[in-house]
UniProtKB/Swiss-Prot annotation:
Naturally occurring in which organism (per UniProt): Vibrio cholerae serotype O1 (strain ATCC 39315 / El Tor Inaba N16961)
Keywords for the protein's UniProt record, in alphabetical order: Amino-acid biosynthesis, Arginine biosynthesis, Cobalt, Cytoplasm, Hydrolase, Metal-binding, Zinc
One GO BP annotation of this record: L-arginine biosynthetic process
Family: Belongs to the peptidase M20A family. ArgE subfamily.
Record's protein name: Acetylornithine deacetylase
Subcellular location: Cytoplasm
Functional summary from the UniProt entry: Catalyzes the hydrolysis of the amide bond of N(2)-acetylated L-amino acids. Cleaves the acetyl group from N-acetyl-L-ornithine to form L-ornithine, an intermediate in L-arginine biosynthesis pathway, and a branchpoint in the synthesis of polyamines.
Catalytic residues (UniProt): 78, 140
Cofactor(s) needed for function: Zn(2+); Co(2+); glutathione
Cofactor info, note text: Binds 2 Zn(2+) or Co(2+) ions per subunit.
EC number(s) from the headed UniProt entry: 3.5.1.16
C-alpha cells in the first residue's frame, strides 16, 4: 500500500476532532488522532508506544532507529474549542484557499505532525546513528497533562528536543510562565441600611487589591531579564465579580488574576511571595480570604543563549533565537533535554477563528526539519 501524501496526512489530522477544554461540554479525547498518527508513523518504520494518561487521553511516543541520544520532535495533539459562528470555513476540514490551509489545528499545532511525516520521507536513513523520536501529547491547551506525564515517566533521554509550536520558523529559546489564581472573599450579607450588621466583601477585596498591586510593584523592582521585550514579570487583575444589589451588603466577591514569571523564578518562591503579600489582610480578616489556583501553574523556560543546540538550529534556520511571552510545553520537556520551540505558522493564528497556515511555510519547514534530522540523528 502506498504511503499517504503530505496533504492526506494533513487532512486526516484536521478532520479528526481532538478538542481539550476545562468545560466538560467541549472536552474530547485524542485517541482517534493518536491512532492515525500511530498508523502513519509505523508505516514509515517507527516503533510505537501509546500511553494512557487519563480516560480518553493518550500520549504517543514513536522511535525510528536505535542507540542513545538523538532528536525528539514534539507537539500536542489537542486543540482549543471554536466559535462556529465566527468561522467562515469548516473548522474540522482542511480548506485550501488564498494559498492557505484553513482549519482548527492547522497552525496550533496538529499540522506540525504532517511536516514531520514529510521530512522523514525525504531523508535517507540508511546511515542513521542516533534515534529520531516523535512525541504527541494530550491536553496542552488545558492542564499540560501529557507533557507533565512524559517528563515524569520519560523512557529515554534524547540529546535535544524541538517543539513545533507556530513560531514562523524562528527558534524560541525562552518564555515566561503562567500562574492564574482566584481570590475569594467571604463577607456577611445584610441590608445596606445598617452596615454594622454585615461584613462587606467588596471592601475587603479593596484591601486585597492594594496588596496585589504592591506585589506587582515588588516583582517589577526585584526581577529583570534583558532578553525579553517586557523584561519583568507581569501581574494582571483580569476579572472581578461581587454582590448582587445596591441595597445589599456584599456577601462574597471573587477576583481572578494571573502572573507571568520570568525563567528562574521558582513556582514555590512565587507562591510564597503571593502568600506573604496577602498575610496582613488575611490576619485582619481571618477565615474570609481564600486563594485558589485556577489551573496547575506553568514555570518559565529558558535554554541558555550560548548553548550549542541554539547555535546549531539558528544556523539551520538562518534565524537568531528569540524569546516570547506565551507558554508552551517547553518548561517540562526542558527537564528531559535541551529544548527549543520552532515550527511553521504564526502564533497570531493560534486560538483564532479561521485559523490558517500559509503555503509559504511548507517547503522551508520540511527543509528545516530534514536538516535537523540529518544533523542530530547521523
Amino acid at each position: 500500500m502506498p504511503l499517504p501524501s503530505f496533504l492526506e496526512v494533513y487532512e486526516g489530522l484536521i478532520s479528526t476532532s481532538s478538542i481539550s477544554s476545562t468545560d466538560a461540554r467541549w472536552d474530547e479525547g485524542n485517541e482517534q488522532v493518536i491512532a492515525k498518527l500511530a498508523d502513519w508513523l509505523s508505516a514509515l518504520g517507527f516503533s510505537i508506544q501509546i500511553e494512557q494518561v487519563a480516560p480518553n487521553k493518550q500520549n504517543l511516543i514513536a522511535k525510528l532507529g536505535s542507540g542513545e541520544g538523538g532528536l525528539l520532535l514534539a507537539g500536542h495533539s489537542d486543540t482549543v474549542p471554536f466559535d462556529e459562528g465566527r468561522w467562515n470555513y469548516n473548522p474540522h476540514a482542511l480548506t485550501q484557499v488564498n494559498n492557505r490551509f484553513y482549519g482548527l489545528g492547522t497552525a496550533d499545532m496538529k499540522g506540525f505532525f504532517a511536516f514531520i511525516y514529510e521530512a522523514v520521507k525525504n531523508v535517507d536513513w540508511s546511515k542513521q546513528t542516533k534515534p529520531l523520536y516523535v512525541l504527541a501529547t494530550c491536553d496542552e491547551e488545558t492542564t499540560m497533562l501529557g507533557a507533565r506525564h512524559f517528563t515524569e515517566n520519560a523512557p529515554f533521554k534524547p540529546d535535544y528536543c524541538i517543539i513545533g509550536e507556530p513560531t514562523s520558523l524562528v527558534p524560541i529559546r525562552a518564555h515566561k510562565g503562567h500562574v492564574a489564581n482566584a481570590i475569594r472573599v467571604t463577607g456577611k450579607s445584610g441590608h445596606s441600611s445598617n452596615p454594622a450588621l454585615g461584613v462587606n466583601a467588596i471592601e475587603i477585596m479593596h484591601e486585597v487589591l492594594f496588596a496585589l498591586m504592591q506585589l506587582r510593584d515588588r516583582l517589577i523592582k526585584e526581577y529583570h531579564h534583558p532578553g525579553f521585550e517586557i523584561p519583568t514579570p507581569t501581574l494582571n487583575l483580569g476579572h472581578i465579580h461581587g454582590g448582587d444589589s445596591p441595597n445589599r451588603i456584599c456577601g462574597c466577591c471573587e477576583l481572578h488574576y494571573d502572573v507571568r514569571p520570568l525563567p528562574g523564578i521558582s513556582l514555590d518562591g512565587l507562591d510564597n511571595l503571593m502568600h506573604d503579600a496577602l498575610r496582613e489582610v488575611q490576619q485582619k480578616w481571618p477565615g474570609r480570604i481564600e486563594l485558589v489556583p485556577l489551573h496547575d501553574p506553568i514555570p518559565g523556560y529558558e535554554c541558555a543563549h550560548d548553548h550549542p543546540f541554539i547555535h546549531g538550529i539558528s544556523e539551520i534556520c538562518e534565524q537568531e533565537a528569540q524569546t516570547v511571552n506565551y507558554c508552551t510545553e517547553a518548561p517540562f520537556l526542558q527537564q528531559v533535554c535541551p529544548t527549543l520551540v520552532l515550527g511553521p505558522g504564526s502564533i497570531d493564528q493560534a486560538h483564532q477563528p479561521d485559523e490558517f497556515l500559509a503555503f509559504e511555510f511548507i517547503d522551508p519547514t520540511v527543509r528545516v526539519l530534514s536538516r535537523a534530522m540529518q544533523k542530530y540523528c547521523f
